[in-house]
Every structure is written in C-alpha cells, then in structure tokens.
C-alpha cells in the first residue's frame, strides 16, 4: 500500500493476490488504491495461479471461489488480470485456468476483462 501510494504513476500486478495467507492484505491494497488514485486502476490482481489442489482446496498460492468472487465484486470488474505469471506451465494447465475463470459466477464483461481487456487498459492499448 505504501509503495503504491508513493509511486503514483507506476502500475502494479499483485500476482497470486497475496496467495491464501495474504489475500485480505492484498485485497485491501487493491481497493485502497482504486478509490484514491487519479487513474481509476493502478493496482491489479494477478489471477494466474488460482487452481485449487486435487482435493478442491486452496494451497499456498491459490484462491477459492469464496475469495475470487469478493475480489471481483469489491475491486470492480476491472481489478483482475490473467496471464502474467506461470508462462512456463503446459497448455492444458492454462486452459484449465481459463475455464475456471469462465465458470465463475461473474458477468461476461468481467470475464472478458480478466482474460484480456483489463491488461489492454493497463498497458494503454485500448
């Protein structure tokens, strides 16, 4: 939060959204900086490592639907981006992550944002 506040022209992606253990702190940074910045979005939630383990439970770096849905709701549809982390994983893993995002109970607009439009905006390509 302090770094984002001190470097107001820099954009951040908080990969793993703090993971299981620091999720609430990361959510606070995302929301705090969304509401006080002149650019509506400078701190993003990186949603690449979000698959639960084989038992359906989150591990150190993944998030459950109980965390993802409030993140998207509280941070607004433009808070999350996909695809910056884990570029070395296999295609099947990436497909499973995309399908997980598509299966969330969120609007099609939110899905499109997470899967590309929010990153386009962050990079000034829109």
Can you name each region flagged by the protein language model?
Residues 74-79, 87-126:
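Mid-to-C-terminal alpha-helical segments outside catalytic/metal-binding sites
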């Amino acid at each position: 939060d302090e770094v984002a506040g001190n470097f107001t022209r820099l954009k951040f992606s908080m990969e793993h959204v703090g993971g299981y253990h620091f999720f609430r702190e990361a959510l606070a940074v995302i929301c705090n900086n969304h509401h006080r910045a002149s650019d509506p979005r400078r701190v993003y939630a990186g949603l690449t490592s979000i698959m639960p383990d084989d038992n359906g439970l989150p591990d150190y770096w993944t998030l459950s639907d109980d965390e993802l849905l409030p993140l998207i709701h509280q941070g607004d549809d433009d808070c999350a981006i996909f695809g910056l982390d884990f570029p070395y994983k296999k295609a099947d893993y990436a497909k499973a992550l995309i399908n997980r995002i598509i299966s969330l109970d969120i609007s099609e607009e939110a899905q499109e944002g997470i899967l590309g439009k929010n990153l386009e905006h962050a990079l000034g390509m829109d």
